[in-house]
Amino acid sequence: MSTNPNPWSPYDSYNDCSQGICNIYCPQWCYLIFPPPPPSFFLDDDSSSSSSSFSPLLIALIGILTSALILVSYYTLISKYCHRHHQTSSSETLNLNHNGEGFFSSTQRISTNGDGLNESMIKSITVYKYKSGDGFVDGSDCSVCLSEFEENESLRLLPKCNHAFHLPCIDTWLKSHSNCPLCRAFVTGVNNPTASVGQNVSVVVANQSNSAHQTGSVSEINLNLAGYESQTGDFDSVVVIEDLEIGSRNSDARSELQLPEERRETKDEDSLPIRRSVSLNSGVVVSIADVLREIEDEEGESGGVGTSQRREEGEDGDGKTIPPTEANQRSGGVSGFFVRSLSTGRFIFSRYDRGRNYRLPL
């Protein structure tokens, strides 16, 4: 039996692949042995835990909760600030109501433009001390601030509708409005309209002559009420002034030149009483006594020198001289009353004086 001298020699020299020996000639019998893979259960736990802790659903939930928390915090801060501001404003309003003065001091008395009233007219409206049992005021609360009236509290009482309001509330309203905030009635009747408006209402009457040929002269009336009409609303004020002193003084001279029918009509005109027509919501009243006093003062100062001399001489509107008789027929015996409507700004005359020649100031 033959033996291999070197049993541990490699089998590289063998070319027979049927023996199942791995060599370079028989690579199909060669196997690569890979190292065993690491245990997989540790990696699965880590990956599952990381994926579960950062899932998109959890991220979305966290974002929603954070946004809701921010919105709630913002709303809380805004509500607290607004509530504090409202309490401060309410306390200041109550303090001003107790003091009875209002928001406007003497340094804030300015005139307002538009439809509102000026400060002097607002201050002239009646101030009333509230008493709960007298029943003089309709209601027990202010319609502007919706707060209850307190006993002996100063309220401003509107003249036409008798609605009462707190001083600061109604003063602020009347700065930009001329009517009642509750019933929309115009605030027209005040206690002292001529002083509150602050306009110079001057009545200038022409000097009257003592001549027997003069039958009357035109009373020139200058009413400086341009600003009054725009500030106090629609005032249907009618002022009627009738000068009967001149008519009574010259009625005899005129009666000699007229026919019996004209004398009868003239007698009816001369017997008319002194009238003063003022609408109910008027703010301006010109007294007849004041007009007569102005006539006497003007006569005493200038001694009858003025527009009456031109009327006495019979001077026409075009500069021509006409006879006294014709001048008497034009002017008439009784100087007619003069009507001026503040709401329309037009000048109208009575039915007795439509045909007379008047010279109105420009």
Curated annotation (Swiss-Prot):
Belongs to the RING-type zinc finger family. ATL subfamily. It is a single-pass membrane protein. GO terms for biological process: protein ubiquitination. A zinc finger (RING-type) spans 142-184. One of its GO terms (molecular function) is zinc ion binding. It comes from Arabidopsis thaliana (Mouse-ear cress). Residues 252-271, 296-333 are annotated as: Disordered. Pathway: Protein modification; protein ubiquitination. Residues 309-319 have a biased composition (Basic and acidic residues). InterPro entries: ATL1/ATL16-like, Znf_RING, Znf_RING/FYVE/PHD. Disulfide bonds: none annotated. This is RING-H2 finger protein ATL52. GO terms for cellular component: membrane. Keywords: Membrane, Metal-binding, Transferase, Transmembrane, Transmembrane helix, Ubl conjugation pathway, Zinc, Zinc-finger. Expressed in flowers. It comes from the Eukaryota. It catalyses: S-ubiquitinyl-[E2 ubiquitin-conjugating enzyme]-L-cysteine + [acceptor protein]-L-lysine = [E2 ubiquitin-conjugating enzyme]-L-cysteine + N(6)-ubiquitinyl-[acceptor protein]-L-lysine. It is an enzyme of class 2 (transferase). Its EC number is 2.3.2.27. Gene3D superfamilies: Zinc/RING finger domain, C3HC4 (zinc finger). The RING-type zinc finger domain mediates binding to an E2 ubiquitin-conjugating enzyme. Its main location: membrane. The chain crosses the membrane at residues 58-78. It is found in: Membrane.
